[in-house]
């Protein structure tokens, strides 16, 4: 079984995905990390190369290659604007695609930053000084990606849960222990 977690940045795909994989005994993959390994460049460099369509196609190719193997896995999917290359995959019997959602305010609380070397750091002073901007951008992302992810069969509202609570709720809601 391949569990694909979709959602906006900072919604909790990676942390929840790692826990979900651990609880189920699955392998965890992060599409951002897979892109870095595939191309040998940082994400900062990657997002500065070529048009978004080409970058999303590469991400979709990586998703295809990961789901091709029969091993059970959880895959945290980078926000994708162009998902047409994986639409047939989403209806595959060995794929469960789930959009993780939460409010802009809850996502803002989890907001972290990364430097040019992809080192993640937290800067709450900066974050809160620019709260209006970030909340607005998060809301725009929720609306944009929400419109794209309407084709996904499964949607899950995190509702401010912790990653542990979210992983357990996903297992219960989607009967993942039985899959």
Predicted regions span which residues?
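Hydrophobic anchor at the beta1->P-loop junction of P-loop NTPases
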Residues: 5
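Walker A/P-loop
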Residues: 14
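Glycine-rich phosphate-binding loop used to anchor ATP phosphates in small-molecule kinases
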Residues: 56-96, 100-101
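ATP-binding Walker
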Residues: 11
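A glycine- and Lys/Arg-enriched "phosphate-lid" helix/loop adjacent to the NTP-binding pocket
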Residues: 94-144
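Conserved substrate/cofactor phosphate-moiety recognition/catalytic segment
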Residues: 22-64
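NTP-dependent small-molecule kinase module
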Residues: 19, 96, 143-179
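P-loop (Walker A) phosphate-binding loop of NTP-binding proteins
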Residues: 8
């Amino acid at each position: 079984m391949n569990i694909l977690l979709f959602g906006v940045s900072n919604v909790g795909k990676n942390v929840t995905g790692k826990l979900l994989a651990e609880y189920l005994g699955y392998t965890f993959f992060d599409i951002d990390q897979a892109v870095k390994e595939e191309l040998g460049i940082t994400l900062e460099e990657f997002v500065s190369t070529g048009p978004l369509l080409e970058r999303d196609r590469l991400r979709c190719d990586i998703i295809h290659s990961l789901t091709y193997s029969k091993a059970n896995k959880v895959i945290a999917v980078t926000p994708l604007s162009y998902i047409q290359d994986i639409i047939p995959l989403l209806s595959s019997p060995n794929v469960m695609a789930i959009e993780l959602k939460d409010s802009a305010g809850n996502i803002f609380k989890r907001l972290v930053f990364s430097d040019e070397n992809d080192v993640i750091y937290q800067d709450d002073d900066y974050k809160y000084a620019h709260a209006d901007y970030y909340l607005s951008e998060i809301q725009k992302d929720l609306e944009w990606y929400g419109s794209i992810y309407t084709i996904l069969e499964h949607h899950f509202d995190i509702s401010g849960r912790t990653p542990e609570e979210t992983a357990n709720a996903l297992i219960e809601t989607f009967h993942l222990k039985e899959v």
